[in-house]
Amino acid sequence: MTEYNPRDLADLVIKPIITEKATLLLEQNKYVFDVLPKATKPEIKAAIESLFDVKVTGVNTIKPPRKKRRVGRFIGHKPLYKRAIITLEEGDTINLFPDV
């Protein structure tokens, strides 16, 4: 097992994703996060376990194709991003909506 620096791991996870599909996955104890495109599955697993103090059983990643964007006569692309679907062990939860 490789040791990771906790400071570097915190930078891998950008934000949680709250969409209709992501909330349906919450019922299956799966959470969706945007992560850096260079992040690997073992790094994502270590980052989630250290940030939220939970046990991760699986990591699935999605790297969708970039969409074209036009500004005047110039054609560019939206930034590349990567999504991670995290499966947690039974009984573990991540509190995405803290009590106000």
From Swiss-Prot:
Entry GO terms, CC: ribonucleoprotein complex; ribosome
Pfam families, A to Z: Ribosomal_L23 (PF00276)
InterPro entries given in the database record: Nucleotide-bd_a/b_plait_sf, Ribosomal_uL23-like, Ribosomal_uL23/eL15/eS24_sf, Ribosomal_uL23_CS
Protein keywords: Ribonucleoprotein, Ribosomal protein, RNA-binding, rRNA-binding
Domain of life from the UniProt record: Bacteria
GO molecular function: rRNA binding; structural constituent of ribosome
Transmembrane segments: none
GO biological process, one term: translation
Function: One of the early assembly proteins it binds 23S rRNA. One of the proteins that surrounds the polypeptide exit tunnel on the outside of the ribosome. Forms the main docking site for trigger factor binding to the ribosome.
Entries under HAMAP family matching the protein: Ribosomal_uL23_B
Family that this chain belongs to: Belongs to the universal ribosomal protein uL23 family.
Subunit structure: Part of the 50S ribosomal subunit. Contacts protein L29, and trigger factor when it is bound to the ribosome.
Protein name per its UniProtKB record: Large ribosomal subunit protein uL23
Gene that produces this protein: rplW
